[in-house]
Amino acid sequence: MSGKDQNKEYRNFSKNLILWQKDFGRHNLPWQKQTNPYRVWISEIMLQQTQVKTVLPFFEKFMKKYPDIKALSKSKIEDVFELWTGLGYYRRAENIYKSSQIIRNKHNLIFPSTFEEIINLPGIGRSTAGAILSLAFNKRYAILDGNVKRVLERYFAIKAEKNIDKELWEFSENLLPKDKNNIYSQAIMDLGATICTKKTPVCEKCPVSLDCKSLKFDLTNVIPIKRKKIIKKEKDLNYLLVVKNKNLVLMQKNPSKGIWANLWTFLNFKTRDDCKKYLKKINLTPNIYNYASIQHNLTHMKLNINIYR
């Protein structure tokens, strides 16, 4: 394909997506009703590694308590954690809180509008910065979240087990329209979320299926190539449940680094014997029993948890 033909294909891709978005894209998400940088930012952080349907009630609750950066910046981090409970990946909540302090102190409570300023906020990478700039400011920046990756891999029939982010970023930037970037960015994310899904893509309803290489060569169920699963490390945790008067529980705050950083948990020890030693130290009888044993899977780690009482 000549460079001229390729440019025409890229223009058609963005043009068709923008037209499709008007009639078939998602328009009723809560962060779309009042589009401003703050709401887009919070939604994009919440949507990192989390599905839209899970995020919806948390976003509404968050906005009710913290409707703007000023309200968030005046809060306590413990209150933000409490509001985040159940959404997971608590580092995101910490980064949101830290960012609100930076925006208050360095930007006079006005959300920054340049790529350099936004990407330097805690918890914001290249794709999240691009999403904020395109969706909230209508600036010409590319995004590359999971949905967009899948659309591009299928459209260009990229069969690769290795990391191909560099190649995908090039495609993502080349496909950008000259204007209406806010509509285009929402469109390509919606396409991946509703049409070009992981399983059973609905190709007959896809606005760019005519030039889709995977559809042409019958590869839609093969691409994206399944990457090798990462073997999770295992870690043992021993929690001690100390209860007073049936309704008071002894807790400790986790360090600022590691699993569940800065969150409150039961007392945590390396071994069962360490639990007993601690009880002796605080003049309590070291008679404990295994109250519960559970396994908990994190993205990168498998936890074997023993709870003693």
Kindly give the residue locations of the regions a language model identified.
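Catalytic cores of DNA base-excision repair glycosylases
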Residues: 7-202, 208-219, 282-285
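Intrinsically disordered, low-complexity, charged terminal extensions of DNA damage-control enzymes
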Residues: 1-27, 32-33, 190-309
